[in-house]
Amino acid sequence: MAAAAAAAGGAALAVSTGLETATLQKLALRRKKVLGAEEMELYELAQAAGAAIDPDVFKILVDLLNLNVAPLAVFQMLKSMCAGQRLASDPQDSVPISLSTSTSETRGRNRGGPILGNVTISAERGSRERPIQRMPRQPSATRLPKVGGSGKSNSRSSP
């Protein structure tokens, strides 16, 4: 009889709604102490926003960001992991980094994780060591080409 009650309890648990599953998941997280109080709030916000992510993966992401790993590096690594490819093997799919705005930001954040930090460092060094090839400047469509040699306007007439 106890086996039948256990089977019925297991069937009832399998039929539980999404809300009950989420509640059970939260209770399991609190028991395991995977996430702290602030991290739990962030995790619940992420779930409310529709992000379905494993709590352990969420904890790793939060830890990386707490270690000042550049968020762009975390994003690129996640993107490459989801695509099933390494970041270095698919350069045309990676997000372009403008070094003028993010150099000071990434330098301070590269101390973080050894994996993600090295990805950012190698990408930054590679772009710095490449010879710069500048394109010739295109003439402006609104300006007329200079005709006179002096470059000064001769609009005044002498009496």
Curated annotation (Swiss-Prot):
InterPro entries: MOZART2
Subcellular location: Cytoplasm, Cytoskeleton, Microtubule organizing center, Centrosome; Cytoplasm, Cytoskeleton, Spindle
Top-level division of the source organism's lineage: Eukaryota
Modified residues (Phosphoserine): 153
Polar residues bias: start-end ranges: 91-105
Keyword Cytoplasm: yes
The keyword Secreted appears for this protein: no
Chain spans, region Disordered: 87-159
GO cellular component: centrosome; cytoplasm; gamma-tubulin ring complex; spindle
Record Pfam families: MOZART2 (PF12926)
Omega-N-methylarginine: residues bearing it: 111
Keywords: Cytoplasm, Cytoskeleton, Methylation, Phosphoprotein
Record family assignment: Belongs to the MOZART2 family.
Description of how the protein assembles with itself and partners: Associates with the gamma-tubulin ring complex (gTuRC) consisting of TUBGCP2, TUBGCP3, TUBGCP4, TUBGCP5 and TUBGCP6 and gamma-tubulin TUBG1 or TUBG2; within the complex, interacts with TUBGCP2; the interaction plays a role in gTuRC activation.
Function: Required for the recruitment and the assembly of the gamma-tubulin ring complex (gTuRC) at the centrosome. The gTuRC regulates the minus-end nucleation of alpha-beta tubulin heterodimers that grow into microtubule protafilaments, a critical step in centrosome duplication and spindle formation.
Name of protein: Mitotic-spindle organizing protein 2
Gene: Mzt2
